[in-house]
């Protein structure tokens, strides 16, 4: 049984989780269109932020983006060759990206599969880092490459990463895939952080017909769920909008990393609540009852055979772990390991000892025995991989 490194501050974290799981007075000056009085009492932070998203979506998205940037949750935002993108507005970046892809399409191998990206929390397909890595991947492999947003612009795409639930996000993603003629013969997929849940959800629900995921590169995915409050520094923003916020993004995540995640309201309005997997055995029944992740894992008390059948249609799975990941707990979950129920905060079960493997709940064991699972890692924190690593991964696993 492998040992896990766990922060000495666990006592403080658990205390804060308890604080945010109890009732807090969340009276607002205007009627919250999403929340009943009970919702506001049980989910004060989520309700407050949902209201602000409705009132000023652009300001909220800018705030979330800045917070993600400060915490290094974004892919490639500090790459040296991003400056040309950083000088342009989101709409110009998207237009430029489309033109570049169209210009090179004539020289592409028509038989090679395109690449589809799903971004992580706080990021957006309209941001420079995602635009840059999408372009790089297409050029490396000589294929059509696209990042699929879950909103019509940067603001909606960013906000939806927090406030559109996981299942609805997958439906939006799937509709975009179905409407793109270049993806109808199948594609290879790359997920970053919680974007892996989008790809995974697509495989679970939509991996049928011809538009199937051939190979799935999962980089620092919360595949096995999130079991603790992720590394999160409070925002440094001094903007007028930030002053309107009574709560910080870290407090929002902390509220979802608690009993508050396991309610119908949280599951409907919070992407992060959908994959909160409380590692304590006492919490497992509520996880089974409420969490979207439990349904996709076939942990909800019944087996959906369609999920297993759809999983089997993907030929290659590449699971990438960051050795110092401070966002995903346990970080070994990026390799489908899970907290040991007997000591959930200090020890993990190897993948082959987990229940989802031994019982082959959704097809992980079948895929492993067929040689479909591959495991990679890089030294460093969440999403801080090198371009050399990225190029090696896609050339090795997408070039087959």
PLM feature segments, named:
Residues 2, 6-11, 19-139, 145, ...:
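Flexible, membrane-associating and regulatory peripheral segments of lipid-active enzymes
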Residues 33, 119, 167-283, 327:
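Serine-dependent carboxylesterase/thioesterase catalytic core
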Residues 48, 306-400:
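C-terminal catalytic-base region of ester-bond hydrolases, centering on the histidine
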Residues 107-110, 181-183, 190-192, 208-212, ...:
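Extracellular/periplasmic catalytic domains that process cell-envelope and extracellular macromolecules
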Residues 116, 146, 190, 217, ...:
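Hydrophobic/aromatic beta-strand patches that form the interior of the parallel beta-sheet core
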Residues 124-126, 156, 197-199, 224-228, ...:
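Short catalytic/ligand-binding loop motif for oxyanion handling, primarily in non-cytosolic enzymes
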Residues 149-162, 227:
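Glycine-rich "HGGG/HGxG" loop immediately N-terminal to the catalytic nucleophile
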Residues 262-331:
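Serine-hydrolase catalytic core
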């Amino acid at each position: 049984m492998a040992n896990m490194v766990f922060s000495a501050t666990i006592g403080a974290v658990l205390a804060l989780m308890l604080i945010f799981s109890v009732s807090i007075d969340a009276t607002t000056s205007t009627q919250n269109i999403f929340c009943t009085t009970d919702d506001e009492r049980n989910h004060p932070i989520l309700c407050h932020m949902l209201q602000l998203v409705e009132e000023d979506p652009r300001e909220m998205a800018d705030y979330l983006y800045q917070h993600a940037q400060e915490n290094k949750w974004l892919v490639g935002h500090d790459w040296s060759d991003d400056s040309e993108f950083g000088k342009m507005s989101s709409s110009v970046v998207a237009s430029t990206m489309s033109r570049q892809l169209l210009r090179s399409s004539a020289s592409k191998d028509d038989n090679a599969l395109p690449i589809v990206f799903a971004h992580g929390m706080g990021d957006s397909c309209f941001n420079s880092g995602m635009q840059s890595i999408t372009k790089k991947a297409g050029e490396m492999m000589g294929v059509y490459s696209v990042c699929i947003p879950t909103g019509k612009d940067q603001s909606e795409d960013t906000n939806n990463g927090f406030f559109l639930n996981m299942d609805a996000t997958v439906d939006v993603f799937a509709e975009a895939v179905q409407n793109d003629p270049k993806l109808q013969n199948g594609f290879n997929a790359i997920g970053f952080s919680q974007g892996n849940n989008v790809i995974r959800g697509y495989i679970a629900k939509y991996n049928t017909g011809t538009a199937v995921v051939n190979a799935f590169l999962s980089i620092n995915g919360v595949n096995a769920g999130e079991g603790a409050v992720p590394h999160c520094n409070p925002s440094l923003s001094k903007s007028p909008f930030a002053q309107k916020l009574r709560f910080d993004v870290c407090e929002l995540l902390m509220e979802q990393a608690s009993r508050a995640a396991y309610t119908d309201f949280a599951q409907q309005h919070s992407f992060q609540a959908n994959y909160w997997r409380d590692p304590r055995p006492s919490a497992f029944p509520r996880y089974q009852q409420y969490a979207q992740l439990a349904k996709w894992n076939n942990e909800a008390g019944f087996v959906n055979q369609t999920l297993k059948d759809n999983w089997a249609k993907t030929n290659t799975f590449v699971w990438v772990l960051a050795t110092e990941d401070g966002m995903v707990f346990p970080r070994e979950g990026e390799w489908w390991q899970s907290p040991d129920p007997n000591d959930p905060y200090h020890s993990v079960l190897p993948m082959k000892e987990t229940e989802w493997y031994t019982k082959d709940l959704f097809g992980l064991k079948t895929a492993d025995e067929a040689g479909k699972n591959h495991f990679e890692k890089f030294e460093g924190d969440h999403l801080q991989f090198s371009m050399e690593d990225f190029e090696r991964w896609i050339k090795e696993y997408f070039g087959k």
